[in-house]
Amino acid sequence: LAGRSGWQVTVGLAEGEPRTADALANRERLRALPVTVLPRDTPPDPQAWTVAVDAVYGTGFHGTLRPEGQAACELLHKARAAGALLLAVDLPSGLTADTGEAAPGAVRADLTVAFDSRKPVHADPRAAEFCGEIVLADIGIPESCHRV
């Protein structure tokens, strides 16, 4: 969306080239968009960023950050320290969705965009300092899916 809106978008692949079928399919979708994908050996310059988007890990994260993920989170922290808005996708990387525990080096976002609905971790007081402001994004899940 940002690229289509005229923003200059640069994407870094935190853990290298995709390996799973879903990741490979999304990589192909990315190639069709007006974005720059950094080569693995090209270090990005977080000082130049206006907005940094954390999409390193998702709701399945638990435990500790892998070295590549740790490096990506450190880069995001540098961007935030330089004045960039740090936006997390669904959940800041390094937070465990089930428990609210944060791994050392977990992302501290200014804004978290939660898909469809808040997750239990979003209400956990321990997660508040990592999530920042939380907003919901409608991704088209029918209301009937919310009924138990």
Language-model segments: residues:
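A cross-family phosphate/adenosyl-ligand binding-site feature
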Residues: L1-A52, Y57, H62-P67, A128
